[in-house]
Amino acid sequence: QSGSREVLARVGVALKFALCDGVMYTLDANAALKERTLSGEESELMTGVSDFTLDATGKALLCVTQDGVVSFGIQTGQSEMLYTGAADQAAMCGQALLVRAGGSIVRVMNGQMATIRRDGATCLLVYGQKVIELTGRGVMTCDVNGENATTIANGSYEAASIANGVLYLGGADGYTQSVSL
């Protein structure tokens, strides 16, 4: 594609970033979650964060810490512990909080916790009402209850990203496969 590029921010080492309403959220190598506005103002929101996911619908950042999963309201600045325990990743799927912990996927909804998948998940993504997990055997989708599981790609992948209804899969050599969702 042709077009011009513009440097929006220089953040040093960013392990992960997300954009919402003109604000960039970054997780740096020191486990600090920061926000940077388009005007260049930067502030530290939380420390001790190992991963985060933007919940654009709920206007919150789901932050994985050593204690569990914290929801940080990006408009209110309020924090709320949503899940206590070991966690590697977190994402919202409708009203359910999904947590990847030790290869399993746990659903938290209405105060009730249930393990919905035990596939050795290495990555958790959500697209619409689909739960997507990378495992050593392939890429699986299921519903929020862990039912209707389907393998959509065979093989082992290290990374996944979703854009415009397409799941991109890859590893050390970059993104090598795509699957329409």
Segments from the language model and where they lie:
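Blade-level signature of beta-propeller repeat domains, shared across WD40, Kelch, NHL, RCC1
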Residues: 156-181
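Repeated scaffold domains used in trafficking and secretory/extracellular systems
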Residues: 12-21, 48-58, 84-95, 119-128, ...
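Short, solvent-exposed loop/turn segments that connect beta-strands within catalytic domains
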Residues: 58-59, 145
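Surface-exposed loop/turn elements that mediate protein-protein interactions on large endomembrane-trafficking
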Residues: 1-10, 31-46, 68-83, 103-117, ...
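Repeated polar recognition positions within modular binding domains
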Residues: 16, 27-31, 50, 67, ...
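Residue position within the beta-strands of beta-propeller blades
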Residues: 25-26, 62-64, 98-100, 131-133, ...
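Short loop/turn segments that connect beta-strands within the blades of beta-propeller domains
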Residues: 1, 20, 29, 38, ...
